[in-house]
């Protein structure tokens, strides 16, 4: 039971960090390449 409580307390923290990093990455891509439907570096 203690392992389940540890998992339930770790998963929201990791998902918050992951989605925060992903949102920051998307914001930075949109800052350097605004409105890019096709990325110019491909």
Curated annotation (Swiss-Prot):
Membrane topology: Single-pass membrane protein
Keyword ATP-binding: no
Keywords: Chloroplast, Membrane, Photosynthesis, Photosystem I, Plastid, Thylakoid, Transmembrane, Transmembrane helix
GO annotation, cellular component aspect: chloroplast thylakoid membrane; photosystem I
Locations listed in the record: Plastid, Chloroplast thylakoid membrane
Highest taxon, organism lineage: Eukaryota
Record has Transmembrane helix as a keyword: yes
UniProt-listed SUPFAM superfamilies: Subunit IX of photosystem I reaction centre, PsaJ
One Gene Ontology biological process: photosynthesis
InterPro entries linked to this entry: PSI_PsaJ, PSI_PsaJ_sf
Record-annotated membrane-spanning stretches: 7-27
PANTHER family to which the protein is assigned, alphabetical: PHOTOSYSTEM I REACTION CENTER SUBUNIT IX, PTHR36082
Family to which the UniProt record says this protein belongs: Belongs to the PsaJ family.
Function: May help in the organization of the PsaE and PsaF subunits.
Protein name: Photosystem I reaction center subunit IX
